[in-house]
Amino acid sequence: MVQDTEVVEAGTSKETETTVDVEKEIQECMGAGKKDLLCNDYSEAVNCFQEACTLLSGKHGQMAEECCEAYYYYGVSLLELARLENGVLGNALKGVPEEDADGDSDQEQEQFEKPDLPETEREKLREEVEAAMATEDEDTQEERGCPRRVEKKKEDDKPKESEKSAEKSDEKEKEEKQAKVESSTVKDVKDEKSSDKPVESSNTEEPGTSGTSASSSKENESEEDPDDISNMQLAWEMLELAKVLYKKHDKSKTNKQMVAQCHLKLGELGLEVENHPQAIGDFLECLVIQKDLLPETDRKLAETYYNLGLAYSFEKRYDNALEHYQSALDVLEARVDMLNELIESNEGNKEKEKEIISECKEVGELKELIPDINSKIEDVILAKKQMQKLDGSPFRQASEGESSSGLGASTSDDKPCSTIPIRKVAPTSVPVAKDSPSDITHLVRRKRPSPDEDNQPAESKENESKKAKQEETEEATNGHSAVKKDTDVTDKNGTNGHSKTPKKDAAKRR
């Protein structure tokens, strides 16, 4: 029995030691992760919080309350790392020199061109190249089935013949020396080729296997692992999990504040992903919780107001953006006034010197933030004015429920300007001369003359013309006679001297 109790005590002591070690490791990981997060070393912070999450979930369970803080900070560090990656490659290209391309081109030129070589070396290189080209031609002919063993034997026998013919003239000696040089260069080139051939054969052997390996590598690259999740997606999952766990467990003030912080970070994530409606919803929920828990001069309220104004401006809801920017400005100005009052009240108190220094530092930070918010407000006002100008411009396309002129709502019978014709001819108007029908008398059939009319003599026609002339002369003579009668009457009255006027004068005298 004594031995059993000793064994049990030893087992419990080992368990306590392991638990203590795990807790220490968790605390170390959390402390190191928070430090890295403050120092903007987000990759190290991600590693530390990831290890802490695995240890806590293994000890307490994945849905335990003890895991909430680790989940939250793990999500925040992932969000910051994703921002760094998305921000034009972050700061990864800061230490990279800008003239890498020029350096590569210079190296390539050095490989292919050597402008500082002397003439002797250039001549040697030319001879070697020519010899190599000749050997290449021979090799190609051998591959085609043209044996050249006889020529090779002759080339090998040339140095022997040159040794025997040492007594010949200088010209022949020069030629023999050149032949020796050429043969030596050819042999060197052949030796190099023989040494290179097994390498080439090893590279060229089994083309099918190499092709399959290349295709398999491409397929592996194209096929994405299902476990490979982006940092942004993983950050969203961890923040959502932390929010749910904080809501599920003890509803204390600190937990509520952490729920608000989870909503704030989820809203920032929505802005990064350009999901502005989701970001606005998270910011509004955060604001509701913060208004209940925080004082009116808290900087967290100003941060939430600012983020809401930013999200509304992205959605082109400029009135809401102005409202929240202005509220953020009011919070900051109220906090500056409060801090100035505290500084004045604690002035001269040596015990609160540190507090005064921190308060003065915060006032300086807030005074730097206020101009930024004022510039945001000015930008929103300008954007709103431009939008109003576009709404009233005649070139803007009319939306539904608007008239094309922009003067208000249009009726159902109205049409936009683009569909109204410029001029329309009324149906009752006189037709245009171009459209009027031409003379069609030539198309009308004329009545054929009767045979009696065709047989009439020409004399009847002459008689008719004479009758017409007689009638004209009679009318003329009748008119002339009437004029003559009138003149005769007047002459008679004048010659007789009897007129009506003298008789009337005589009657008056009587």
UniProtKB/Swiss-Prot annotation:
- Compartments where found: Nucleus
In terms of Gene3D superfamilies, this protein maps to:
Tetratricopeptide repeat domain
The record's section on PROSITE patterns has: TPR, TPR_REGION
Q: Name one GO molecular function term.
A: histone binding
Entry keywords, A to Z: Developmental protein, Nucleus, Repeat, TPR repeat
GO biological process terms, alphabetically, are:
CENP-A containing chromatin assembly; DNA replication-dependent chromatin assembly
Tissue expression as described in the entry:
Embryo and larvae.
Organism superkingdom:
Eukaryota
- Compositional bias annotation for Basic and acidic residues: 111-129, 142-199, 459-471
Cellular component GO terms, alphabetically?
nucleoplasm
What residue spans carry the Acidic residues bias annotation?
98-110
Tell me the segments the record calls region Disordered: 95-227, 391-510
The record's TPR repeats, renumbered to this chain, cover 260-293, 302-335
Show the ranges annotated as biased composition (Low complexity): 204-217, 398-411
The listed location of motif Nuclear localization signal is 444-451, 465-471
Q: State the Pfam families in the record.
A: TPR_12
> Its function?
May function as a nucleosome assembly factor during rapid embryonic cell divisions.
Q: Which family does it belong to?
A: Belongs to the NASP family.
Q: What is this protein called?
A: Protein HGV2
| Organism for this UniProt entry | Halocynthia roretzi (Sea squirt)
